[in-house]
Amino acid sequence: MKTDIEIAREAKLKKIAEIADGLGIHDDNVIPYGKYIAKVPYSVIDDAKVKKNNLILVTAITPTKAGIGKTTVSIGLALGLNKIGKKAVAALREPSLGPCFGMKGGAAGGGYAQVLPMEDINLHFTGDFHAITSAHNMISALFDNYIFRAQGTPKAIKTVLWKRVLDVNDRNLRQVVTGLGEGNGVVMESGFDITPASEIMAIFCLAKDIEDLRRRIENIILGYDTENNAVKVKDLGIAGSIVVLLKNAINPNLVQTTENTPAFIHGGPFANIAHGCNSVIATKTALTYGEYVITEAGFAADLGAEKFFDIKCRKAGLNPKLTIIAATTGGLKMHGDVPEKEISKPNAEALKKGLANLDKHIENMKKFGQTVVVALNRYGYDIDSELELVRKHCEAQGVGFAVNNAFVEGGKGAVELAELVVKTIETNPSKPLKFVYEDKDSIKTKIGKICKEIYGAADVTYSGAADKMIKKIEEAGMADFPVCVAKTQYSFSSDPKLYGVPTGFEMNVRDIVLNSGSEMIVAIMGDMMRMPGLPKDPQAVRIDLVNGNVEGLS
């Protein structure tokens, strides 16, 4: 089979104006970025259509290092729905440069189920990530200047919370000292997070419009003064400057798939260190024009889907009609104690054992009132008997099941899934959304409910620093914010080596971060870092420009 990049280059793309016209977007509302990419102003959002049309979430079982192919399922389903005559639109996240040059090598789907132009999407795209990085670091520079000027005054800063960000994987930047050298500012310990972990990214993806963006940016807490008063962006009077840097980026990006299905790609927080969903604005824009809108939440259902429901849907008033859990036989075997290098070998017993991981995710999604369909991503190593084993297991539980072969066959390979999705939404759509916790619950109650009900933890403990921060948040009257857990994506627990469905484990909250602008409380567990490092063999060594063509992206 051809490589992803070969398939992408051979695809016959339509001009983006034609894609927009097919959706019913007036040409006055198409802002071209070349021939095949455009921005669409969020002013086109029609709330009546948003409520009427069908939102579908794609999530997954606990992933292997290679992933489960969730984006391939999302794009494949959009292709399959269009294949059977439905008006489908994908609403996905933008890839981060860090993982593209690190482990993943790209995040635009795969095979014959890709969003295009793949090279542009995976690299700089429309500059949204650069705008977010610039906005975040502009705040850093202006706050450092404020700190420098406020020395020796009643406004002097005692505690600095705000770091810097870059869209790279660079472990050397996790802890740094700034201000060294005479006349170079105030010496302080600081660090860098990756751009998808930036609070600006979270705000960008949760804001409903430019004024909401401004309000949230103004409310970001940067640090505390000598009298322990919170210092916010609005105290510096710089929110206008930051909004100016984001005024174009806030509009969602329109592209197309390998079969010219429209897709909005906008925003890109990770689900292990942030809330893991594309922008509310892009999702609502897609729902304005698409009868069926397929979106996804990062990593597995315990991370991305929980945050999608408890944070994004809670705040945006969204109510999905269906949740799809993507799985692979290889991923299930890994949860049945097969080493990752051997998951391509037939092993029915390990597959049966690994189904417990799928069952736990199904159980969790039902807690949110969701109707569930399982989409098994077909790989070249799959054998029919193992596919049937998973099918029969799902059917015995009353859960819909379909094989997705869009990677190899495009939309044709997702027709079975598309037909099942339409039938399920028509006959048994999800119930009104339920949440794991209530706004009025205490911070520890919220964290406890997520850890015990969704992850299956036996207990939750807190470091002294976490306890201290929880008390400070409660005293500030912000305890009603939703909780965003930062933990490993490779296990229900905070230990990435505990596969399957571990029990009896303890979760430790190492730190608590208040994101007062994005209005969420981040609970950091285990060894989770908000700035990833590079692997021993990064994808960057395979990326090159050959005769004007990019090689090594996938």
From Swiss-Prot:
Top-rank EC class of the record's enzyme: ligase
Gene Ontology molecular function: any one: ATP binding
Transmembrane segments: none
Keyword Transmembrane listed: no
UniProt catalytic activity: (6S)-5,6,7,8-tetrahydrofolate + formate + ATP = (6R)-10-formyltetrahydrofolate + ADP + phosphate
UniProt keyword Membrane present: no
Enzyme Commission code(s) on record: 6.3.4.3
Pfam families: FTHFS
GO biological process terms on file: tetrahydrofolate interconversion
Keyword annotations of the record: ATP-binding, Ligase, Nucleotide-binding, One-carbon metabolism
Database matches in HAMAP family: FTHFS
Similarity remark: Belongs to the formate--tetrahydrofolate ligase family.
Name this protein carries in UniProt: Formate--tetrahydrofolate ligase
Species this protein is from: Treponema denticola (strain ATCC 35405 / DSM 14222 / CIP 103919 / JCM 8153 / KCTC 15104)
Gene from which this protein is expressed: fhs
